[in-house]
Each structure stands twice: as structure tokens, then as C-alpha cells.
Amino acid sequence: MSKKQDTRTMRDAADRVAASLNRRQFLGRGMALGAGGLLVDLGLSRYAQAQNSPTPPAGGAPPRRPPPPPEPTVSQAPPLKDLKGKVAYITAASDGIGLGIARAASNAGMKVVIGYRNEERLKAALPLFKAGNAGVLPIKHDVTDRDGWKALVEQIKSQYGKLHLVVNNAGIKTLTPASKAKYEEWDNAVAVNMTAIYNSVAACLPHMLEHGEGGHFVATASMGGLLPGVNAGVYTATKIAAVGTMEALRVELESTNVGTSVFCPGGVNTDNYFASGEQNPFRKPLPPGAARFGGMSMDPLEAGERVMNGVVNNDLFILSHPEFKPGMQERFDAVMASTPPVEAPIAQGRIDAERGVIRCGIYEREIAHRKVKRSSYRSV
């Protein structure tokens, strides 16, 4: 195949990928993301030109570096700055963090749909909502059921007309090393902690974009999504995936009025903190000292209020436990220390092809976003 034919084939492939991912959101970004995270540069003619150009000899021209990023600007305006009267759906909201988020959303004047699986927990949760549970709709829901997601959206539309906020809170804390996990443990954790996020986006995003009033997705990950846990390899893998999914969605949805956040809490005082939640058939007994630790952990309602603060500000990262900051700094320092220096010229075509990953912009904008005046979550 000639270089011209090869370039045309790559360009056609890029166009097909861009079209399948809503091309209008990617034009101007110079990239499209295909299956497996393959980055395809939409300006492939420059890539082909670079491949036809000889590489400068070592010691000749100075190493070519990526172009400087544009001056960072604040990310998209918060789509849900005003929560009153909006509709929220929170998965696994009959207890724990999910219940805390649901109560905080209700306190802000939102209509709240509670996803649950355990009738007894739901019965204990409902009296915690004010005004006789006005504006609270429980729906029994398995987050791994894709047809169930479609039915849920239709039920919410029938009851309230629109859906604005989806909080993917259902999760399984599998206290199993990745090296010793059973296939079923891995599959179950992936289905609930990872795939359920995709299920929610596939079912709910088209509706949010259609009604145009603004929308937001939150995924409850964990500090395990940023730092590996001891004897929790399966859990860590799924929570890192949750963080990456929400980062990728931020890139994809920045040009829309749908925001994204990932919540990475430390310890929260719930009976599920160690025992893994309702959808885990591999639930294990609490380890020694767990009850004492739970009493020192964050109250679920406080965690929920932090999430709602993140929503009204459209924070990409919602972190609640500052004691983990040294560990996160060590991790990122280790990544930077492991990155080799630029020792030889880098082909411009390679830089062009990698541009969308070299500087996708969401991190610079998140830093700038943190420096502007912030809104506060308010109860009504």
C-alpha cells in the first residue's frame, strides 16, 4: 500500500470513529478515541508529512518538544448550579454513602429517586427524609441490568418529566488480592463498580442532552481509585477504572451542558464500608477493629453534602479526606520520576498523533476552576 493510500485509509477510519462518538464534540480537539483507547489524529495529513521528513541527526537540531498548552481557562459552566426542583437518581441509596447523597440532594430541594435492593434498609431510610418523603421515589433496581436502566429512565420521565443528576454509587468492596480472586469475584466487581457506570451513561445521557436543562453524572469511586489498597487488588482495579471513565467523559462532554464528577472518599461511617454492599455474594465478615474505625469515619450526610457541593461547582474531582494527600503526592512524584527526559528529537508526526493525550486540557482547566469563586451547597 502506498503512503497516500495508507493515509487515506487512516483518515477514513478516524472519520468513522469520530462519527460514532458524536463528531461535533471532537472537531477542533484534533482527535478521536477509538476502541481500546487508540488515539487517532484527525489531522493525519501532517502525520504523513512528518513521516516523509528526515529526522534531524542526534546532536543537530534541539529536541522537539510538544507545543505549549493554551492558557488554562475554567472548565464548562456548572450545568446544575441551581438544584431546586431538579431530579436526581442515586443508585444504592437505601443506606450508607448513597443515602447520605440522597438526603443532601433532597435537602437542596431536588426530587430524589432512590435506587435500592433491600426492602428492610429502604424502610429504615425513608423516615430520614423531611416533609413526609415528599419528592422521594424508591425504585428497586439492579445496576447491572441494562434493560432495567432503560425502564428506570422511562419511569422517572413518567413521574417527574425529566432526569438531571445520576449518581452511580452502587459498589462492591471486594477485600481480595487480585492474585487470589476467584473469577466470579472479579466479574461481579467489574459488573457493579465499572460496567454499571457505562450502563447509566448509555441509558441516561441521550435524555439529558435532549431536554437541554443541564445534567450531571457522578461516580462514587474511592481513595482506592487513586491509591492501591492492601489486599484489595480487585477493588482497586475497578475504582481506578471508575476514575478514568469520569475523566474521559469530562473530555467528551465538555462542549455540552452535562457535567461529570468522580467522588473519591476515604472512610465513611456505614455498615457497608468493609462488607461490600447489597450486590456482593462474596461478602466477607468485618475485619478486627472495623467497628471502632467506623465510629471515627465521616458521617454519610457530610459525605453527601460534599458530593452536592461538587455537583453545583461541576468539580471533576470530589475529594473529602485530606489525610490521603501525602500518598497521592508520592504516587504522582513516582510517575514523574519514572518519565524519561527528552534526549533526542521527537518526530513532529508523533507529537501530533499524541496531542490529545499529551495535553487534553481537563487538568489545567480543573486547576484554574479551583481558583475562581465557588458556589455553596444549600439546604432549603
PLM feature segments, named:
Residues M1-N22, Y47-Q49:
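N-terminal secretory signal peptides
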Residues S94-G96:
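Conserved glycine-rich cofactor-binding loop
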Residues V251, S255-G327, D333:
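SDR active-site lid
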